[in-house]
Amino acid sequence: MKKLIILAVSVFALFTSCQQRPQVFGVYIDGTFEQFLKDLDKEPWKCPINIDTIQHLSESEISIKAFSTEVIDLNEDSVKVDSIYITIELEKEKIKQFSYTLDMSETDFKAIQHAYERIYGSVKYHDITEYGNYCSWMIGKTSLWLSYDFAEQQTKYEYFIY
């Protein structure tokens, strides 16, 4: 049975040059979420979001409150993001989907898209509809989707693990 966990956190996105995935900084944790961070990295305040690492976690290990500040390295000017929502969908202790949404402009979305192109290579799929701007990459067995909702003015990241 799938369990949907929504974790609301505040975030700052600092755009600087770097060739790695986004990293979470300044994490204030509660319960087993602390162990979750320690398992990913011995320095929980500088812990990368690593989809491959968190696949094995069970529902009880991850349904915990947390507050974090995130740095997204993009070689752009600093931008403050008001909120971020992390969604983790679990089935039989394996994560099927990992997504989070940021309140930001389409300009910020395009900056993130260009940064991901530098990190992951050319976009596999790209489309612009009346509802939003969509693009995706394939990273091994993981599909990374980046979309911008015109109505909500939100950028959403989604990881689908196959």
Regions found by a protein language model. Give the residues of each.
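A general secondary-structure signal for short beta-strands and their flanking turns/coil
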Residues: 61-64, 81-83
